[in-house]
Amino acid sequence: MSEEHQESYHSDNLIDLMNHTLTNDHLQLLKKLGEMAAKLRMNLFLVGGTVRDMLRGVPGGDLDLVIEGDALAFSQNVANVLGGKVKHHEPFATATWVGAENLKLDIVSARAESYAKPGALPTIRHSHITDDLARRDFSINAMAIHLHPASYGQLVDPFHGRHDLTNGLIRILHSQSFIDDPTRLLRGVRFVSRFNYRFEQKTANLALATQPALTNALANVSPERIVHELKLLCHETDPVSSFSKLEDLHVWQALLGLTFSSSSATHLSRLQEEQNGEPLHWFQAIATVGFLEDNWKASLVPFAITAMEQRFLQNIEDIQKRLTNMTRFSTDYLHKQLYQVPEEPLRFYALSSGEEMQKVLDLYLHQRKQLQPLLTGHDLMELGMKPSPLFKECLLLHECEQLKGTIENKQDALQFAREFFNHKQPL
């Protein structure tokens, strides 16, 4: 261990904690890798969420390693000695090694980062562990454990992450952190929710004080990066609280130009209840933000990356237009207007509605789900009708009559079809 970094190492040794929280396979692997790195005159460290969770008493998960040296060369050396497969990610100086029984670890060269402009992806250069930890989002994620045989188990904690863990604080590492990478705000709120922590006061103040710059920085972040963070946020146990916290920090205004109001919170709560313990779909979750405000659809379009999400937005717009122009809401009339709209956007819309409209749409969806059409196109051809656009009208209208209760059996349905084609009634 070089003298220039000794001041960063916590006096506590975490060997006992490692033995308690890591599997035997992981422990043996880490010791072996530390020895291999030492023989190559390199320092190897366990970093990130595994260290954080160990200190919280939570069993370790994935192994993320940082080496003061060439991660690509070291990972290849690991594969040569221990077997397994290695995949290099050369632009980022990272590698993934998979060994026997699916033992997996990610190895990264220690590096420093600089940002050409707020929100942009960073430029990296090789460096030491302290610089590598300094590029991370929060102090609780900026700790490492030394794996060198002479220092094995020593905690590297230059930003006092262990203190913040003990006190339940989420703290950024420098004043430009949120501007350099605005997605850190989303991650911070996720950790606040997951661990029941709070933002350290200066961190909270900086989040609020940097709003104009934050809006500009977010414009440089790709929708895919933001979507990734939103998906993770929606897998937490209390997304409503997280979305409300993002509103308090003005993130929704900066990101979408929309407001997560009390009605948005009610809408999201109803959506979550409908999931029966399953994670929320991230796109439906953010669609509750400023739902049906004037610029709602335009604000969400950049994040509607898949065809399914694009159709969802279009379906909601169609529902809104049709319901706005309707003067009666009987089930059969609703069916004429909404029969082509899938159940999911209808449920979403219903959950945003007032009590009366929600009851109307719930009843329609229930009856539509129970509907078993008594007529088919084959039936119409057997009646001597030639296929035409009127087939679709006839089949739809007979479903409406079924919902109304005027068609109760097959004979009623066939009689309806005969009369329809005799009169060629349009919709």
Swiss-Prot record:
UniProt-annotated binding residues for ATP: 49-52, 136-137, 141, 181-190, 194, 225
EC annotation from Swiss-Prot or TrEMBL: 2.7.7.-
Keywords, comma-separated and alphabetical: ATP-binding, Magnesium, Metal-binding, Nucleotide-binding, Nucleotidyltransferase, RNA-binding, Transferase, tRNA processing, tRNA-binding
Cofactor field: Mg(2+)
Reaction(s) catalysed by this chain's protein: a tRNA with a 3' CC end + ATP = a tRNA with a 3' CCA end + diphosphate
Binding site for Mg(2+): 62, 64
Keyword RNA-binding among UniProt keywords: yes
GO molecular-function term, one example from the UniProt record: ATP:3'-cytidine-cytidine-tRNA adenylyltransferase activity
Domain of life, per lineage: Bacteria
Xref: InterPro entries: NT_sf, PolA_pol_head_dom, tRNA_nt/polyA_polymerase
Enzyme class: transferase
Entry's Gene Ontology BP terms: tRNA processing
Keyword Phosphoprotein: no
pH-activity relationship: Optimum pH is 8.
The family this protein is said to belong to: Belongs to the tRNA nucleotidyltransferase/poly(A) polymerase family.
UniProt xrefs under PANTHER family: A-ADDING TRNA NUCLEOTIDYLTRANSFERASE, POLYA POLYMERASE
Function: tRNA nucleotidyltransferase involved in the synthesis of the tRNA CCA terminus. Adds the terminal adenosine residue to tRNA.
Name listed for the protein in its UniProt record: A-adding tRNA nucleotidyltransferase
Species per Swiss-Prot/TrEMBL record: Halalkalibacterium halodurans (strain ATCC BAA-125 / DSM 18197 / FERM 7344 / JCM 9153 / C-125) (Bacillus halodurans)
Species classification: Bacteria, Bacillati, Bacillota, Bacilli, Bacillales
